[in-house]
Amino acid sequence: MKRLTLVCSIVFILFILFYDLKIGTIPIQDLPVYEASAKTAVQEPAYKTVKVKPGDTVMSIVGSAGSPDDIVKDFEALNPNVKANAIQAGTAYKFPVYP
C-alpha cells in the first residue's frame, strides 16, 4: 500500500511538472510593442520676431501670458548671448509666443 501511494504521488508530481512546463498555468499577456524612435526632435518654442522700440521691455512685448521666470528663460533660450534685461532699441529679437 505504501508503494502504491509513493508511485501515485511521484506520477502525480511528474504530471504537474509536465503540465506546468508544457502548457503553463499563468496566461501570457500580449503586451503591445512600441518601436523606439531613434531621434527625439527638440522643439523650439513658438516665437515671433519683433524690432524693439525705445522703452520696450521683454515683459511689455510678450505680455502676461506666463510666469516672468519662464518668459525670461524662453527669451534667453531663443536669443543666445542676450540677457532679457539688456535688450537694445532698434534691434530685432525673437520673443516667445504663448497660447
UniProtKB/Swiss-Prot annotation:
Position of the signal peptide: none
Domain named LysM: residues: 48-95
Cellular localization per UniProt: Secreted, Cell wall; Membrane
Protein's name according to its UniProt entry: Uncharacterized protein YqfZ
Segments passing through the bilayer: 6-26
Bilayer topology annotation: Single-pass membrane protein
tRNA processing as UniProt keyword: no
GO cellular component, one term: extracellular region
Keywords attached to this entry: Cell wall, Membrane, Secreted, Transmembrane, Transmembrane helix
InterPro entries in the cross-refs: LysM_dom (IPR018392), LysM_dom_sf (IPR036779)
Location, primary (coarse class): secreted
SMART domains: LysM
